[in-house]
Amino acid sequence: MPSLAPDCPLLAMPEETQEDSVAPMMPSQRSRGPLAPNHVHEVCLHQVESISDLHSGAGTLRPYLTEEARPWDELLGVLPPSLCAQAGCSPVYRRGGFLLLLALLVLTCLVLALLAVYLSVLQSESLRILAHTLRTQEETLLKLRLASLSQLRRLNSSEAQAPS
Protein backbone atom coordinates (compact mmCIF):
# COMPACT_ATOMS: atom_id res chain seq x y z
CA MET A 1 0.00 0.00 0.00
CA PRO A 2 1.46 3.40 -0.90
CA SER A 3 2.53 5.55 1.98
CA LEU A 4 1.31 9.07 2.54
CA ALA A 5 3.84 11.80 2.12
CA PRO A 6 4.85 13.36 5.46
CA ASP A 7 3.86 16.87 4.31
CA CYS A 8 0.40 15.79 3.11
CA PRO A 9 -2.41 16.47 5.55
CA LEU A 10 -4.79 13.58 5.98
CA LEU A 11 -8.15 14.72 4.67
CA ALA A 12 -11.45 13.26 5.75
CA MET A 13 -13.28 11.53 2.95
CA PRO A 14 -17.00 12.13 2.43
CA GLU A 15 -19.26 9.27 3.41
CA GLU A 16 -20.08 8.45 -0.21
CA THR A 17 -16.41 8.07 -1.07
CA GLN A 18 -15.76 5.94 1.99
CA GLU A 19 -18.62 3.63 1.05
CA ASP A 20 -17.22 3.26 -2.45
CA SER A 21 -13.63 2.72 -1.40
CA VAL A 22 -14.14 0.25 1.45
CA ALA A 23 -15.19 -3.06 -0.05
CA PRO A 24 -15.02 -6.46 1.64
CA MET A 25 -12.40 -8.77 0.19
CA MET A 26 -13.75 -11.75 -1.67
CA PRO A 27 -12.25 -15.18 -0.89
CA SER A 28 -10.76 -15.34 -4.39
CA GLN A 29 -8.91 -12.06 -3.76
CA ARG A 30 -7.28 -13.40 -0.60
CA SER A 31 -5.86 -16.43 -2.36
CA ARG A 32 -4.04 -14.32 -4.95
CA GLY A 33 -0.28 -14.04 -4.83
CA PRO A 34 1.54 -10.82 -3.96
CA LEU A 35 0.82 -7.88 -6.21
CA ALA A 36 3.49 -6.39 -8.43
CA PRO A 37 5.27 -3.41 -6.89
CA ASN A 38 3.62 -0.11 -7.65
CA HIS A 39 5.74 2.67 -9.10
CA VAL A 40 3.79 5.33 -7.25
CA HIS A 41 5.71 5.83 -4.01
CA GLU A 42 3.58 8.53 -2.42
CA VAL A 43 -0.04 9.45 -2.59
CA CYS A 44 -0.85 13.00 -1.66
CA LEU A 45 -4.52 13.95 -1.39
CA HIS A 46 -5.36 17.65 -1.63
CA GLN A 47 -8.81 19.06 -1.14
CA VAL A 48 -10.14 21.05 -4.09
CA GLU A 49 -13.28 23.11 -4.27
CA SER A 50 -13.86 22.69 -8.00
CA ILE A 51 -12.30 21.22 -11.12
CA SER A 52 -11.07 24.67 -12.16
CA ASP A 53 -8.82 24.69 -9.07
CA LEU A 54 -6.87 21.84 -10.60
CA HIS A 55 -6.23 23.82 -13.79
CA SER A 56 -5.61 27.27 -12.37
CA GLY A 57 -3.79 26.26 -9.20
CA ALA A 58 -6.08 28.38 -7.07
CA GLY A 59 -7.46 27.57 -3.68
CA THR A 60 -5.84 25.09 -1.34
CA LEU A 61 -3.58 23.62 -4.05
CA ARG A 62 -1.41 26.75 -4.38
CA PRO A 63 1.42 25.59 -2.03
CA TYR A 64 1.67 22.20 -3.73
CA LEU A 65 1.85 23.50 -7.30
CA THR A 66 4.99 25.59 -6.78
CA GLU A 67 7.29 22.61 -7.25
CA GLU A 68 9.88 22.92 -10.00
CA ALA A 69 9.22 21.34 -13.36
CA ARG A 70 10.36 17.74 -13.39
CA PRO A 71 13.15 16.70 -15.75
CA TRP A 72 12.42 14.68 -18.86
CA ASP A 73 13.89 11.44 -17.50
CA GLU A 74 11.72 11.64 -14.41
CA LEU A 75 8.61 12.13 -16.52
CA LEU A 76 9.53 9.15 -18.66
CA GLY A 77 10.38 7.15 -15.54
CA VAL A 78 6.67 6.69 -14.93
CA LEU A 79 6.81 3.69 -17.24
CA PRO A 80 7.56 0.45 -15.41
CA PRO A 81 11.15 -0.70 -15.96
CA SER A 82 9.90 -4.18 -16.87
CA LEU A 83 8.12 -2.70 -19.88
CA CYS A 84 11.33 -1.11 -21.11
CA ALA A 85 13.27 -4.31 -20.44
CA GLN A 86 10.82 -6.31 -22.55
CA ALA A 87 11.07 -3.78 -25.37
CA GLY A 88 14.85 -3.75 -25.08
CA CYS A 89 15.15 0.01 -24.62
CA SER A 90 17.53 1.85 -22.38
CA PRO A 91 17.12 5.31 -20.83
CA VAL A 92 19.21 6.74 -23.67
CA TYR A 93 16.62 5.72 -26.27
CA ARG A 94 13.52 6.71 -24.29
CA ARG A 95 13.31 10.28 -25.55
CA GLY A 96 14.12 9.31 -29.12
CA GLY A 97 11.58 6.51 -29.02
CA PHE A 98 8.98 8.83 -27.57
CA LEU A 99 9.63 11.41 -30.28
CA LEU A 100 9.51 8.68 -32.92
CA LEU A 101 6.15 7.47 -31.60
CA LEU A 102 4.92 11.06 -31.50
CA ALA A 103 6.02 11.60 -35.11
CA LEU A 104 4.33 8.35 -36.10
CA LEU A 105 1.15 9.48 -34.38
CA VAL A 106 1.23 12.84 -36.18
CA LEU A 107 1.86 11.11 -39.51
CA THR A 108 -1.03 8.72 -38.86
CA CYS A 109 -3.31 11.65 -38.05
CA LEU A 110 -2.31 13.38 -41.29
CA VAL A 111 -2.96 10.22 -43.30
CA LEU A 112 -6.36 9.80 -41.64
CA ALA A 113 -7.20 13.45 -42.36
CA LEU A 114 -6.24 13.01 -46.02
CA LEU A 115 -8.28 9.82 -46.18
CA ALA A 116 -11.27 11.63 -44.68
CA VAL A 117 -10.99 14.42 -47.27
CA TYR A 118 -10.63 11.88 -50.09
CA LEU A 119 -13.66 9.91 -48.90
CA SER A 120 -15.66 13.11 -48.54
CA VAL A 121 -14.84 14.13 -52.13
CA LEU A 122 -15.59 10.61 -53.34
CA GLN A 123 -18.92 10.63 -51.52
CA SER A 124 -19.92 14.03 -52.94
CA GLU A 125 -18.96 12.86 -56.45
CA SER A 126 -21.02 9.69 -56.11
CA LEU A 127 -23.96 11.73 -54.77
CA ARG A 128 -23.67 14.04 -57.78
CA ILE A 129 -23.72 11.04 -60.15
CA LEU A 130 -26.65 9.52 -58.26
CA ALA A 131 -28.60 12.79 -58.47
CA HIS A 132 -27.92 12.96 -62.23
CA THR A 133 -29.08 9.35 -62.66
CA LEU A 134 -32.26 10.01 -60.68
CA ARG A 135 -33.01 13.13 -62.76
CA THR A 136 -32.52 11.13 -65.97
CA GLN A 137 -34.78 8.34 -64.71
CA GLU A 138 -37.41 10.86 -63.66
CA GLU A 139 -37.35 12.45 -67.13
CA THR A 140 -37.61 9.00 -68.76
CA LEU A 141 -40.52 8.07 -66.51
CA LEU A 142 -42.30 11.32 -67.39
CA LYS A 143 -41.81 10.62 -71.12
CA LEU A 144 -43.18 7.08 -70.68
CA ARG A 145 -46.25 8.41 -68.86
CA LEU A 146 -46.88 10.93 -71.64
CA ALA A 147 -46.51 8.18 -74.26
CA SER A 148 -48.86 5.94 -72.28
CA LEU A 149 -51.49 8.68 -72.02
CA SER A 150 -51.14 9.37 -75.74
CA GLN A 151 -51.64 5.67 -76.55
CA LEU A 152 -54.65 5.51 -74.22
CA ARG A 153 -56.26 8.53 -75.94
CA ARG A 154 -55.69 7.01 -79.38
CA LEU A 155 -57.19 3.72 -78.23
CA ASN A 156 -60.23 5.46 -76.75
CA SER A 157 -60.74 7.57 -79.88
CA SER A 158 -60.44 4.51 -82.19
CA GLU A 159 -63.00 2.57 -80.09
CA ALA A 160 -65.39 5.50 -80.21
CA GLN A 161 -65.14 5.70 -84.03
CA ALA A 162 -65.52 1.95 -84.63
CA PRO A 163 -69.11 0.85 -85.53
CA SER A 164 -70.71 -1.43 -83.04
UniProtKB/Swiss-Prot annotation:
The keyword Zinc-finger does not apply. It is a single-pass membrane protein. GO terms for cellular component: membrane. The chain crosses the membrane at residues 97-117. It is found in: Membrane. InterPro entries: DUF4714. Keywords: Membrane, Transmembrane, Transmembrane helix. Signal peptide: none annotated. It holds the Pfam family DUF4714. Its main location: membrane. This is Leucine-rich single-pass membrane protein 2.
